[in-house]
């Protein structure tokens, strides 16, 4: 599905060559993207993957907003895709992933560590993480013999995905633009489909397991992450956790891992109610940081900040929530709230909890932070020598071959 998203817009349609299409999109639309999104669900084991088509245009170009995305998803010549063009796009994706592993390994480590316990993160890994990279690399290694099957699979996927069954539409604009868009778009040219809904409900996700991996990349430093869904541990992550994350990140972890340990960066995240994670960025060693993370809860349990510092932690949390967003970004946030089954009032409640947080409340979280550090699976991306010096018993994987 990721390859389908990346190849749409890059190939000719039944109406335009690839160059003509590129010029049309640049002249008529502000943007057009095809991406995958994986939504966590109220059930900790629930997973809802989506293919997201996003587009924007000026009011006077509403007709193009209705017609061009439809042309791309419905008439791209996937069965006749040019081999060299497909290979080039796939190679660009591979290079981008490899650069991400090398330069932003903490993000890759966070995603991989989450996949050790979260079904939704397993799907994310298959769509855009290490699993996808390994699939892509193998595909490129056997490109000529697999090209015809790839073309057929892409066309079959497009036929199953772009149907009205299960399709949701979201529009951001004035009432006049809304009416004009739907007058032009009609039914979006989507057929009813033949069992697409059943296929969606029948998604089977491999059971997560802690692989305890260390991926070798060309580097003399490492990136590490320990992550989990706090619901697995029976923890309710309130707004006070965000304040605790700030205190841990900019006080304890900063001093212990960055200043004393020599890492370029580090932190603790409490992202909403469905992810908690420790991470390090460009760290010269693995084991010392793991030991310091293990002591984070003990530090928080005896946290005695001065009033000004504590207010600073709260203000930085709340200001992040209060930062103005453009209408499209606000719509994306609301869409995520709906699709992930989140409480629509949770954001306001979380903000109020941040403002009401006290040092005593943060101290009470110390034991839970210790438990998160102890029970969250860990993943590392790093240089071979750095990994070899660790005694943490990682399963070492030569990622880039």
Q: Can you name each region flagged by the protein language model?
A:
Residues 7-8, 25, 29, 73, ...:
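Hydrophobic, Leu/Ile/Phe/Ala-enriched alpha-helical segments that form helix-helix packing faces
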């Amino acid at each position: 599905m990721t390859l389908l998203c990346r190849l749409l817009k890059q190939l000719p349609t039944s109406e335009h060559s690839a160059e003509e299409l590129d010029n049309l999109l640049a002249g008529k639309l502000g943007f057009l993207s095809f991406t995958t999104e994986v939504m966590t669900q109220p059930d900790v084991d629930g997973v809802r993957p989506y293919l997201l088509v996003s587009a924007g245009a000026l009011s006077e170009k509403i007709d193009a907003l209705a017609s061009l995305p439809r042309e791309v998803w419905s008439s791209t010549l996937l069965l006749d895709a040019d081999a060299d063009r497909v290979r080039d796009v796939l190679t660009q994706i591979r290079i981008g992933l490899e650069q991400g592993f090398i330069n932003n390994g903490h993000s890759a480590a966070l995603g991989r560590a989450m996949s050790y316990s979260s079904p939704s993160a397993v799907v994310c890994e298959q769509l855009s993480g290490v699993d996808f990279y390994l699939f892509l690399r193998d595909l490129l290694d056997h490109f000529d013999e697999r090209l015809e099957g790839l073309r057929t699979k892409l066309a079959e996927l497009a036929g199953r995905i772009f149907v009205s069954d299960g399709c949701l539409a979201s529009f951001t604009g004035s009432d006049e633009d809304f009416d004009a868009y739907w007058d032009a778009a009609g039914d979006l040219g989507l057929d009813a489909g033949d069992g697409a809904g059943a296929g969606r409900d029948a998604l089977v996700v491999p059971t997560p397991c802690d692989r305890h991996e260390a991926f070798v990349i060309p580097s003399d430093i490492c990136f590490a992450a320990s992550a989990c869904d706090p619901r697995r541990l029976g923890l309710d992550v309130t707004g006070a956790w965000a304040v605790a994350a700030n205190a841990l990140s900019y006080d304890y972890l900063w001093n212990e891992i960055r200043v004393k340990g020599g890492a370029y960066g580090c932190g603790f995240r409490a992202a909403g109610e469905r992810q908690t994670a420790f991470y390090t960025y460009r760290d010269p060693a693995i084991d010392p940081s793991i030991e310091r993370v293990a002591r984070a809860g003990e530090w928080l349990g005896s946290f005695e900040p001065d009033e000004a510092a504590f207010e600073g932690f709260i203000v930085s949390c709340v200001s992040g929530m209060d930062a103005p967003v453009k209408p499209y970004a606000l719509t994306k946030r609301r869409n995520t709230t709906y699709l992930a089954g989140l409480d629509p009032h949770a954001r306001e409640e979380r903000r109020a909890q941040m403002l009401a947080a006290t040092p005593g409340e943060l101290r009470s979280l110390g034991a839970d932070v210790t438990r998160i550090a102890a029970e969250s699976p860990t993943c590392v991306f790093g240089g071979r020598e750095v990994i070899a010096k660790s005694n943490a018993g990682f399963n070492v994987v030569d990622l880039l071959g």
